[in-house]
Amino acid sequence: MAHITINQYLQQVYEAIDSRDGASCAELVSFKHPHVANPRLQMASPEEKCQQVLEPPYDEMFAAHLRCTYAVGNHDFIEAYKCQTVIVQSFLRAFQAHKEENWALPVMYAVALDLRVFANNADQQLVKKGKSKVGDMLEKAAELLMSCFRVCASDTRAGIEDSKKWGMLFLVNQLFKIYFKINKLHLCKPLIRAIDSSNLKDDYSTAQRVTYKYYVGRKAMFDSDFKQAEEYLSFAFEHCHRSSQKNKRMILIYLLPVKMLLGHMPTVELLKKYHLMQFAEVTRAVSEGNLLLLHEALAKHEAFFIRCGIFLILEKLKIITYRNLFKKVYLLLKTHQLSLDAFLVALKFMQVEDVDIDEVQCILANLIYMGHVKGYISHQHQKLVVSKQNPFPPLSTVC
C-alpha cells in the first residue's frame, strides 16, 4: 500500500464508497493508516485528480485529505488542521445525505479523531509562534465535533441497526478529551444528559463505555460527588482490557483518592503492580491518623499530584486524617466525654503548628458538621460528648 499511485488510491476510495464499505473507506482517510506516508499521495493540489474519479462532496473531502498528508509531511500542523476541518465539513454533507443508513460511521470516527489530534498539534505550533492562546484550535474543533454529534443525535430512524445514534458516544468521548484539556468541564453536562437518556447507553462497545465512565467519573470527583465518582471509575477500571496496564494505571490515579475519601485504602501490592507508590505514604498517613506523615507525603510527591490534577482532592484527606487521629484518642480514653485538651495533645504530638484549643474546637465542629463524628461540643465543660452508638461512622456512609 505504501507506494501505490494517486489513481490506484482514488480507485480504492471510489470502490469503498460505491460498495458502502465504511471500514475500508475509514482506513483510506485515516492518519493511522500507512498510506499517509506515501510520498506519491502527498500533494499540494490534488483537486483535479479527485474530481475526475469522485462525486461531490467526496472529491473535496479526499482532496483535502491528500493536502493534509502533504502538510503533515512538511510538519505544518496549522495547515493540516485547516485541511482536516474541510474533510470533516465535506464528510458531514455526505453523511447527512445518507438517509436511513449508517455505514459511514467508521469514517466519521477516523476523521473526528484526526481533527482532535491536529487541533492539539496546531494549538502547540500557534502558541510557540505567539499567534494564539492555548486551546483556541481545540475549541474550534469541538464546535465541529458538536455538529457531527447533532447529526447523530437527531437521527430518529425507526430501525436501530441503521441509526446514526451509534456514533454519539464516540463523539462525546472526543469532546470530553477536549473539554478536559481546555478546562471547560461545564460543557460536559448536556452531553452526559444526552447519553444517560439514550436507549443505547448500555449497548455501545465496552471500550467506548470505559472511556465515557472514566471521564464522567473524573468530573464527578471534581464536583465532590465521590460515591458517583467511585461507581463510574470502578466500572472503568474493572472493564478496562487487562492488557491495558497504562490505561488501568491512569484510571487508578483518580479512583484511589476517591476510594480513600470513602475509607477504602489501597494495598501496597496494588500500588506496586501499577507503579503508583507515590500513594503509599499518603495511604499509611491517613490510616494511622498521622498528620505529620501526610504533610510530608503530599509535599514529597507534590509535582506528580499536581500534574495529575489531584493535589487538591488529596488535601481533602486531611479531614479524614483528623477523624482517624481523634478516633484513636477516643479508643485510648474509652469514654464518651472527651476532654478537648486530649485532642490538643494529640495534635501537638503530630507537630501541627500554632495549634490551640480554639483550633481544636474548629476542627471538631467541622468533623461533626460533615458527619464524621456523632456528638457535640460542650463549651462549658470543654469536652467533646460523643454518641454511645457508632460515634465515628464509616466514611462510606458519610461522603
Swiss-Prot record:
The modification Phosphoserine is found at S45. Gene3D superfamilies: Winged helix-like DNA-binding domain superfamily/Winged helix DNA-binding domain. Its main location: cytoplasm. InterPro entries: Csn12-like (IPR045114), PCI_dom (IPR000717), WH-like_DNA-bd_sf (IPR036388). GO terms for biological process: negative regulation of gene expression, epigenetic; negative regulation of lymphoid progenitor cell differentiation; poly(A)+ mRNA export from nucleus; positive regulation of B cell differentiation; post-transcriptional tethering of RNA polymerase II gene DNA at nuclear periphery; protein transport; spleen development; transcription elongation by RNA polymerase II. The modification N-acetylalanine is found at A2. Component of the nuclear pore complex (NPC)-associated TREX-2 complex (transcription and export complex 2), composed of at least GANP, 2 copies of ENY2, PCID2, SEM1/DSS1, and either centrin CETN2 or centrin CETN3. The TREX-2 complex also associates with ALYREF/ALY and with the nucleoporin NUP153. Interacts with BRCA2. Interacts with SRCAP chromatin remodeling complex component ZNHIT1; the interaction results in inhibition of SRCAP complex activity, preventing the deposition of histone variant H2AZ1/H2A.Z to lymphoid fate regulator genes and restricting lymphoid lineage commitment. Required for B-cell survival through the regulation of the expression of cell-cycle checkpoint MAD2L1 protein during B cell differentiation. As a component of the TREX-2 complex, involved in the export of mRNAs to the cytoplasm through the nuclear pores. Binds and stabilizes BRCA2 and is thus involved in the control of R-loop-associated DNA damage and transcription-associated genomic instability. Blocks the activity of the SRCAP chromatin remodeling complex by interacting with SRCAP complex member ZNHIT1 and inhibiting its interaction with the complex. This is PCI domain-containing protein 2. It comes from Homo sapiens.
